[in-house]
């Protein structure tokens, strides 16, 4: 399935794995890339040494293109940015900050730079800075979110820039992929695996950094503190290391389990290959069937 994004990144299907911290390990990234999508190592708040280790592991498992998601608030962002050049990583997606200071070095090294954006203003700025594409991520997505839905955000970003747009947030099957392409996207990004649609809560609105997570003891405590007018420091103390606690330590009660609203649509467990091939096949069938209906 060819699009401008598959040509740009050298992948078979226009499906990109979300940059999920601690979840986006070498094993998952390699599996996604082997299946024809673009696997992504989620650097999150991890040290550069961990990211380097994951890059080496992916290279051992696949010769297909893969990328790294760099959260620019990471204390070791500078070191990781240099590491991507040293290790000849082909693609970097960025979030939680402005990647402009790294652009020149990345572009010289031939790295494809794809920032995550939540507004047309940021999309335009990233295009001007030299981004190869942007990921327009709606508020339905898991983790750090903006306020605009995918349905509203994607066409606005498509109209605002002259580089390819990848849609993210609330896409779990061929219907969502077809909708994204009708809005002008050239690929999709997926992350959330499985949960109930009623189980996500948004915390951190009072801090200006909203995050969508599965509802658990931590979100209940956080929302209670927010409603009581707790300070940023108090709220930060509660969530510090929460994602690692959930993903690495397995404490999904007191940890931060980031997930999107679309989780309720995912009702079974399948391999990366089955998911990617299935969603692309379903998308094609939907577009063809709807074209026939409209033509009647």
Language-model-detected regions and their locations in the chain:
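Active-site metal-binding loops of divalent metal-dependent hydrolases
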Residues: 20, 170-171
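Conserved active-site-proximal phosphate/metal-binding subdomains
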Residues: 152-166, 172-296
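Active-site entrance/lid segments in N-terminal catalytic domains of soluble metabolic enzymes
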Residues: 1-160, 164
